[in-house]
Amino acid sequence: ASFRAIAVEPKDSPVISQTLAGEPLKPGPHKIQGTGAGFVPGNLHLKNAAGAEQITECVKVSNDDAVAMARRLAKEEGILGGISTGANVHAAIEVAKRPENAGKLIVTIGCSTGERYLSTILADEARAKVSN
Protein backbone atom coordinates (compact mmCIF):
# COMPACT_ATOMS: atom_id res chain seq x y z
CA ALA A 1 0.00 0.00 0.00
CA SER A 2 1.19 3.51 -0.72
CA PHE A 3 -0.41 4.90 2.45
CA ARG A 4 -0.58 3.40 5.92
CA ALA A 5 -2.35 4.84 8.96
CA ILE A 6 -0.59 3.96 12.20
CA ALA A 7 -2.18 4.78 15.53
CA VAL A 8 -0.21 5.73 18.64
CA GLU A 9 -1.31 4.84 22.14
CA PRO A 10 0.05 4.60 25.69
CA LYS A 11 1.84 1.32 26.39
CA ASP A 12 0.00 1.20 29.72
CA SER A 13 -3.47 1.66 28.20
CA PRO A 14 -3.49 -0.04 24.77
CA VAL A 15 -7.22 0.13 24.07
CA ILE A 16 -6.86 0.49 20.28
CA SER A 17 -4.60 -2.57 20.09
CA GLN A 18 -7.00 -4.49 22.30
CA THR A 19 -9.94 -3.49 20.09
CA LEU A 20 -8.09 -4.47 16.88
CA ALA A 21 -7.25 -7.85 18.45
CA GLY A 22 -10.86 -8.39 19.58
CA GLU A 23 -9.79 -8.43 23.23
CA PRO A 24 -11.71 -6.93 26.14
CA LEU A 25 -10.60 -3.40 26.96
CA LYS A 26 -8.23 -3.18 29.91
CA PRO A 27 -7.27 0.48 30.16
CA GLY A 28 -4.62 1.47 32.64
CA PRO A 29 -3.22 4.61 34.22
CA HIS A 30 -0.63 6.54 32.22
CA LYS A 31 0.81 10.03 31.84
CA ILE A 32 0.06 10.69 28.15
CA GLN A 33 -2.91 13.02 28.48
CA GLY A 34 -5.47 13.00 25.68
CA THR A 35 -4.85 9.38 24.64
CA GLY A 36 -5.68 5.94 26.00
CA ALA A 37 -8.79 7.23 27.75
CA GLY A 38 -10.18 3.73 28.27
CA PHE A 39 -12.33 3.66 25.14
CA VAL A 40 -11.99 3.95 21.38
CA PRO A 41 -13.64 7.21 20.26
CA GLY A 42 -16.62 6.78 17.97
CA ASN A 43 -14.99 8.95 15.30
CA LEU A 44 -11.94 6.66 15.06
CA HIS A 45 -13.04 4.29 12.33
CA LEU A 46 -10.77 1.26 12.58
CA LYS A 47 -12.28 -0.27 9.43
CA ASN A 48 -13.68 1.34 6.30
CA ALA A 49 -17.15 0.78 4.83
CA ALA A 50 -15.91 -2.33 3.00
CA GLY A 51 -14.61 -3.80 6.27
CA ALA A 52 -10.92 -3.33 5.48
CA GLU A 53 -8.66 -2.12 8.26
CA GLN A 54 -7.89 1.58 8.08
CA ILE A 55 -5.55 1.52 11.07
CA THR A 56 -2.94 -1.02 9.99
CA GLU A 57 -0.80 -0.87 13.12
CA CYS A 58 -0.74 0.61 16.57
CA VAL A 59 2.56 1.72 18.13
CA LYS A 60 2.63 1.63 21.92
CA VAL A 61 4.71 4.35 23.61
CA SER A 62 5.81 4.41 27.25
CA ASN A 63 5.27 7.39 29.52
CA ASP A 64 9.03 7.92 29.77
CA ASP A 65 9.56 7.86 25.99
CA ALA A 66 6.70 10.32 25.40
CA VAL A 67 7.95 12.77 28.05
CA ALA A 68 11.57 12.44 26.91
CA MET A 69 10.63 13.21 23.30
CA ALA A 70 8.47 16.19 24.28
CA ARG A 71 11.40 17.58 26.27
CA ARG A 72 13.76 16.88 23.37
CA LEU A 73 11.47 18.70 20.94
CA ALA A 74 11.52 21.76 23.20
CA LYS A 75 15.26 21.67 23.82
CA GLU A 76 16.51 20.78 20.33
CA GLU A 77 13.81 22.07 17.98
CA GLY A 78 12.14 24.88 19.94
CA ILE A 79 8.79 23.09 19.69
CA LEU A 80 6.79 23.28 22.92
CA GLY A 81 4.60 20.25 22.38
CA GLY A 82 2.58 18.31 24.89
CA ILE A 83 3.19 14.78 26.07
CA SER A 84 0.94 13.27 23.38
CA THR A 85 2.92 15.17 20.76
CA GLY A 86 6.05 13.60 22.27
CA ALA A 87 4.41 10.18 21.95
CA ASN A 88 3.50 10.78 18.29
CA VAL A 89 6.98 11.98 17.34
CA HIS A 90 8.63 9.12 19.24
CA ALA A 91 6.42 6.61 17.38
CA ALA A 92 7.11 8.27 14.01
CA ILE A 93 10.86 8.06 14.59
CA GLU A 94 10.60 4.39 15.55
CA VAL A 95 8.57 3.66 12.40
CA ALA A 96 11.06 5.63 10.27
CA LYS A 97 13.99 3.57 11.64
CA ARG A 98 12.59 0.35 10.16
CA PRO A 99 14.55 -0.88 7.12
CA GLU A 100 11.40 -1.27 5.03
CA ASN A 101 10.67 2.44 5.53
CA ALA A 102 14.03 3.71 4.26
CA GLY A 103 13.44 6.65 1.93
CA LYS A 104 9.72 6.86 2.76
CA LEU A 105 7.95 9.97 4.01
CA ILE A 106 6.69 9.56 7.57
CA VAL A 107 4.18 12.16 8.78
CA THR A 108 2.82 12.70 12.28
CA ILE A 109 0.69 15.27 14.06
CA GLY A 110 1.71 17.58 16.88
CA CYS A 111 -1.69 17.56 18.53
CA SER A 112 -1.04 19.58 21.68
CA THR A 113 0.95 22.48 22.97
CA GLY A 114 3.14 22.07 26.03
CA GLU A 115 1.90 25.31 27.56
CA ARG A 116 -0.86 23.56 29.47
CA TYR A 117 1.58 20.96 30.84
CA LEU A 118 4.06 23.30 32.54
CA SER A 119 2.85 22.12 35.97
CA THR A 120 3.24 18.42 35.09
CA ILE A 121 6.09 15.94 34.80
CA LEU A 122 6.89 17.46 31.40
CA ALA A 123 8.43 20.57 32.98
CA ASP A 124 9.81 19.13 36.24
CA GLU A 125 13.43 19.82 35.26
CA ALA A 126 12.72 23.39 34.14
CA ARG A 127 10.78 24.20 37.32
CA ALA A 128 13.62 22.78 39.44
CA LYS A 129 16.17 25.02 37.68
CA VAL A 130 14.01 28.11 38.18
CA SER A 131 13.46 27.28 41.86
CA ASN A 132 17.18 27.09 42.64
Region roles according to the model:
Residues 2-83, 121-132:
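Active-site/ligand-binding loops adjacent to catalytic centers
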Residues 13-16, 88, 115-116:
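Short, active-site-adjacent cap segments at secondary-structure transitions
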Residues 29, 44-48, 90-132:
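Phosphate-binding loop/pocket of nucleotide- and phosphate-handling active sites
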Residues 80-92:
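Substrate-binding/catalytic subdomain of NAD(P)-dependent oxidoreductase enzymes
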